[in-house]
């Protein structure tokens, strides 16, 4: 006889905003993609950008690709929760989608740089959990950028030149993960997410649940 299936107890909690940043080539996008595939309770915040679309990228899935004029219109109407200029291109987070998700208690992942992370921390500090991904070495970072084979030598040189300045902001993040092994780094990030979901201050439903326990009479 099979044992009865016990349904998980649902305790209301606030959604969290998971911010993952790193210099180009350190692995944040791969870790973010793997996390989304493994965790059905997490959805991606799709950024808008003025950067040219890469061959492997899909409109609306990886980014919303905009002209500079379209991007400036979004900024002017306060339609972006945060925005930044990175490697000569603009990136931003659409406000409406994030506010809707937080209102419904859903978790969202943000694959953004340190400038965007700063703005989110300033505006929604209680909801943000930030993780910075470091490469094991600068030599390995350069090797990964070349292996990716999606950028020109000029673009790779620019990204490497900017990476040191980006790494300088590591102290501003809640957690630091060194990506010397992708599986190990992914496991570390996933453990962080699970722990943050269990924080008492993220779970207002605990008050009702605990009060119910204390008033329960099993006899």
Swiss-Prot record:
The protein's Enzyme Commission number: 2.7.4.8
Xref: InterPro entries: GK/Ca_channel_bsu, Guanylate_kin-like_dom, Guanylate_kinase, Guanylate_kinase_CS, P-loop_NTPase
Protein name: Guanylate kinase
NCBIfam families in the cross-refs: guanyl_kin (TIGR03263)
Substrates-to-products reaction catalysed: GMP + ATP = GDP + ADP
Matching SUPFAM superfamilies: P-loop containing nucleoside triphosphate hydrolases (SSF52540)
Cellular component terms (Gene Ontology): cytosol
Cited CDD domains: GMPK
Family matches, as PANTHER family: GUANYLATE KINASE (PTHR23117:SF13), GUANYLATE KINASE-RELATED (PTHR23117)
Annotated keywords: ATP-binding, Cytoplasm, Kinase, Nucleotide-binding, Transferase
Role according to the record: Essential for recycling GMP and indirectly, cGMP.
Pfam families per record: Guanylate_kin (PF00625)
Domain Guanylate kinase-like: 15-194
Family named by the database record: Belongs to the guanylate kinase family.
Binding site for ATP: 22-29
One Gene Ontology term of the molecular function aspect: guanylate kinase activity
Protein's cellular compartments: Cytoplasm
